[in-house]
Amino acid sequence: MRGMKLLGALLALAALLQGAVSLKIAAFNIQTFGETKMSNATLVSYIVQILSRYDIALVQEVRDSHLTAVGKLLDNLNQDAPDTYHYVVSEPLGRNSYKERYLFVYRPDQVSAVDSYYYDDGCEPCGNDTFNREPAIVRFFSRFTEVREFAIVPLHAAPGDAVAEIDALYDVYLDVQEKWGLEDVMLMGDFNAGCSYVRPSQWSSIRLWTSPTFQWLIPDSADTTATPTHCAYDRIVVAGMLLRGAVVPDSALPFNFQAAYGLSDQLAQAISDHYPVEVMLK
């Protein structure tokens, strides 16, 4: 009888702990992330401190042709314990000599990256592709959250093409559904979705905005910039009943690292001109 009570208590504790586990996910445009930035110990310290807040972090504007900076970043993220973070990184993406990578860093004790692919947006040499930097989509499996499998679609939109690229994410979502049979999808990144790049009159032409399939978690009123501007450039959008239901209420917001760490304007903007946007899943 005593053994049965102990077993029951352990099962209850396990259920309680599992219920308390949440997954924190972020998208962070780290301005011109490369070897120069990773050679500055002060900046590295803060970048690692910021990224260590998250179980999955999408890093954008990775300018690192040989993955030297990415390697240094992972070394720093894993300095206290090996395999604290793993990563998935895209090839350099862009229509001309200027190229960027998408980088996902994630905690393998919380999630697994189980698959990935590049969205086929048309013929780049022909000039009829949709995105300047086509999404490199990653499928994750989480043992501890209400939604076990979900995909993340990253986008760093070109400012001048922001309206068209955000609208085209609707097609990317349909493609993910067709390829993986997956409805639970998070679309995130620096969409340049505000101020002069997306005018109020243009939202009605963006299917990702008008379709009830999608829930925008970062509002237009948010400021995701570390500069004197006030713009909601960086966004998190979710689709799928399980994923939408797993979002912790009021957890989606920019992380103002300048205020959190008491940084000067100069130091904050040396880290990046953007704040991360984050959300928690239960």
UniProtKB/Swiss-Prot annotation:
> Record's PROSITE patterns?
DNASE_I_1, DNASE_I_2
Keywords linked to the UniProt accession? Actin-binding, Apoptosis, Calcium, Cytoplasmic vesicle, Disulfide bond, Endonuclease, Glycoprotein, Hydrolase, Nuclease, Nucleus, Pharmaceutical, Secreted, Signal, Systemic lupus erythematosus
Organism, by scientific name, is Homo sapiens
Signal sequence region: 1-22
Record annotation: effect of changing V114M: In allele DNASE1*5
Q: Where is this site: Nitration by tetranitromethane destroys a Ca(2+) binding site and inactivates enzyme?
A: Y87
Gene Ontology MF, one:
deoxyribonuclease I activity
Q: Cofactor(s) for this protein?
A: Ca(2+); Mg(2+)
Family, as annotated: Belongs to the DNase I family.
Keyword Cell inner membrane attached: no
Q: Mind telling me which residues the site (Involved in actin-binding) is annotated on?
A: E35, V89
Task: Give the note describing cofactor binding and stoichiometry.
Answer: Divalent metal cations. Prefers Ca(2+) or Mg(2+).
Q: Which domain of life is it from?
A: Eukaryota
Report the protein name in the record. Answer: Deoxyribonuclease-1
Q: Which InterPro entries match?
A: Deoxyribonuclease-1_AS (IPR018057), DNase_I (IPR016202), DNASE_I_2 (IPR033125), Endo/exonu/phosph_ase_sf (IPR036691), Endo/exonuclease/phosphatase (IPR005135)
Say what the protein does.
Serum endocuclease secreted into body fluids by a wide variety of exocrine and endocrine organs. Expressed by non-hematopoietic tissues and preferentially cleaves protein-free DNA. Among other functions, seems to be involved in cell death by apoptosis. Binds specifically to G-actin and blocks actin polymerization. Together with DNASE1L3, plays a key role in degrading neutrophil extracellular traps (NETs). NETs are mainly composed of DNA fibers and are released by neutrophils to bind pathogens during inflammation.
* Disease implicated: Systemic lupus erythematosus: A chronic, relapsing, inflammatory, and often febrile multisystemic disorder of connective tissue, characterized principally by involvement of the skin, joints, kidneys and serosal membranes. It is of unknown etiology, but is thought to represent a failure of the regulatory mechanisms of the autoimmune system. The disease is marked by a wide range of system dysfunctions, an elevated erythrocyte sedimentation rate, and the formation of LE cells in the blood or bone marrow.
**What taxonomic lineage is listed for the species of origin?**
Eukaryota, Metazoa, Chordata, Craniata, Vertebrata
GO BP terms: namely: apoptotic process; DNA catabolic process; neutrophil activation involved in immune response; regulation of acute inflammatory response; regulation of neutrophil mediated cytotoxicity
All disulfide bonds of the chain are C123-C126, C195-C231
Glycan attachment positions: N40, N128
Task: List GO terms (cellular component aspect).
Answer: extracellular exosome; extracellular region; nuclear envelope; nucleus; zymogen granule
Q: What is the effect of changing R244Q?
A: In allele DNASE1*1
